[in-house]
């Protein structure tokens, strides 16, 4: 492969749809490899725009606007970084010869919980929670009666906990159904109703596909473990490697491989697995680097962002090694504001083995993720303790 020089004829070019903190790290990795970078998002000064060669601000659900930019830029590959995009436009662009990472169909399926559950549970037959699909409250009631209360209602267009509602009895169904549909990450007409299980452990199995001289290769990385409070949809901390039993790791990696191979394409996928008692259950998958995988910037010799960029360019990543036990803990805003400032960074960095990534988001709102602390240690527990302490010191004003 030949890689040219950015901004000159012959340059390799990647275009991101979405410019958040995950996109920023991908753009940085691409810049290190001499790639020309373009970022598109719904608001100006998104984190990845700070480090890209060019930027565009458009409605990400406007298919015509997306297609116009891509045809103007003519990138070597299109990388999706967010869920709220026009997936039909991606399918159309792909049919015209544009390369979508991982592929347009995978992006569309991963955004739709119903289609993803059909693929995972019914097509490749990996274990999941008991479930049913519903278009109205009456259908929800029937499914909950069959499965048993409590149940969880999730809108078909959702991810990372958005619009998830726990239903404890029949009297709550009408209101919870309405709330689930209202808080979807796009237009949703159906919901998936799942059994409520006690989650003992939550894992992310980073699974990636790349092309070498022998064909397509699929590999998994030792699982990341993560935690999110029960009352919020976002993750708070992750650590790597997970300390779950070997049997659980093997099952989790097997299920992740089966799902990702069915989705196809190239790049890294964040496959979420839940452990409940002796059950190891597939939950969902992101067709891109995963937020819990921010920890790989400290734990791996080749982080998830570089792996994704390599795969997008048709480059191999034959081996990934853990270089240290590590943990990541988010830095959250506590109020609404503009042009935030960060206090006590110097105190946090006095802790050995700690790094801080501030994302550069131009505005804040309650519990918005504004940065992350990365920490290494002799053990995962030591790294977690360092990350928690450092994150508690940093204040967002």
From Swiss-Prot:
Binding residues annotated for ATP, in chain numbering: 113, 154, 194-197, 202
Catalytic activity annotation: N(1)-(5-phospho-beta-D-ribosyl)glycinamide + formate + ATP = N(2)-formyl-N(1)-(5-phospho-beta-D-ribosyl)glycinamide + ADP + phosphate + H(+)
Entry keywords, A to Z: ATP-binding, Ligase, Magnesium, Metal-binding, Nucleotide-binding, Purine biosynthesis
SUPFAM superfamilies cross-referenced by the UniProt entry: Glutathione synthetase ATP-binding domain-like (SSF56059), PreATP-grasp domain (SSF52440)
Cellular component aspect of the GO annotation: cytosol
Disulfide topology: none
Pathway annotation from the record: Purine metabolism; IMP biosynthesis via de novo pathway; N(2)-formyl-N(1)-(5-phospho-D-ribosyl)glycinamide from N(1)-(5-phospho-D-ribosyl)glycinamide (formate route): step 1/1
Transmembrane segments: none
Binding site for N(1)-(5-phospho-beta-D-ribosyl)glycinamide: 21-22, 81, 291, 361, 368-369
Its EC number(s): 6.3.1.21
UniProt xrefs under InterPro entries: ATP-grasp, ATP-grasp_carboxylate-amine, ATP_grasp_subdomain_1, PreATP-grasp_dom_sf, PurT, PurT/PurK_preATP-grasp, PurT_C
Top-level EC class as recorded in UniProt: ligase
All copies of domain ATP-grasp, residue ranges: 118-313
Biological-process GO terms, alphabetical: 'de novo' IMP biosynthetic process
Pfam families: ATP-grasp, PurT_C, RS_preATP-grasp-like
GO molecular function: ATP binding; magnesium ion binding; phosphoribosylglycinamide formyltransferase 2 activity; phosphoribosylglycinamide formyltransferase activity
Residues holding Mg(2+): 272, 284
Quaternary assembly: Homodimer.
Family, as annotated: Belongs to the PurK/PurT family.
NCBIfam families cross-referenced by the UniProt entry: PRK09288.1
Function: Involved in the de novo purine biosynthesis. Catalyzes the transfer of formate to 5-phospho-ribosyl-glycinamide (GAR), producing 5-phospho-ribosyl-N-formylglycinamide (FGAR). Formate is provided by PurU via hydrolysis of 10-formyl-tetrahydrofolate.
UniProt-recorded name of the protein: Formate-dependent phosphoribosylglycinamide formyltransferase
Source organism: Sulfurisphaera tokodaii (strain DSM 16993 / JCM 10545 / NBRC 100140 / 7)
High-level lineage: Archaea, Thermoproteota, Thermoprotei, Sulfolobales, Sulfolobaceae
